[in-house]
Amino acid sequence: MTKKAIIPAGTTKPIAPFVPGSMADGVLYVSGTLPFDKDNNVVHVGDATAQTRHVLETIKSVVETAGGTMDDVTFNMIMIRDWADYAKVNEVYAEYFAGEKPARYCIQCGLVKPEALIEIASIAHIG
């Protein structure tokens, strides 16, 4: 097995020892992605719609850096702080996965920063 770190240009420097994506044997694992700017500050505070879009754009960047598209995403793990944001998250999510939908789960939980309303981790099969 060959493992390769996937780090898009201009990516936020992680606050822990991990990379945005890791590719092995055609499978891309995208780390839990939060609505952070380049300095690890939460963006769009209080706006679940904008935070979801920011997170999915970041995931898209990782997938594209690995040579794939969002159509290659086969699984998403979604964590939201407040279940009241579920419909907003789904509305934005549907924009990024308009065709064949990936499998997923969604849970409500606390996140690493209190201003963060969403975190998504993904798996994609590329090639």
UniProtKB/Swiss-Prot annotation:
Catalytic activity field: (Z)-3-aminoacrylate + H2O + H(+) = 3-oxopropanoate + NH4(+)
UniProtKB keywords: Hydrolase
Listed GO biological process terms: nitrogen utilization; uracil catabolic process
Keyword Hydrolase applies: yes
Entry EC number(s): 3.5.-.-
Molecular function as annotated in GO: deaminase activity
A Pfam family this chain is assigned to: Ribonuc_L-PSP
Domain of life assignment: Bacteria
InterPro entries, sorted: RutC, RutC-like_sf, YjgF/YER057c/UK114
GO cellular component, as recorded: cytosol
Role noted for this protein: Involved in pyrimidine catabolism. Catalyzes the deamination of 3-aminoacrylate to malonic semialdehyde, a reaction that can also occur spontaneously. RutC may facilitate the reaction and modulate the metabolic fitness, rather than catalyzing essential functions.
Family to which this protein belongs: Belongs to the RutC family.
Name this polypeptide is given: 3-aminoacrylate deaminase RutC
Organism this protein belongs to: Pseudomonas savastanoi pv. phaseolicola (strain 1448A / Race 6)
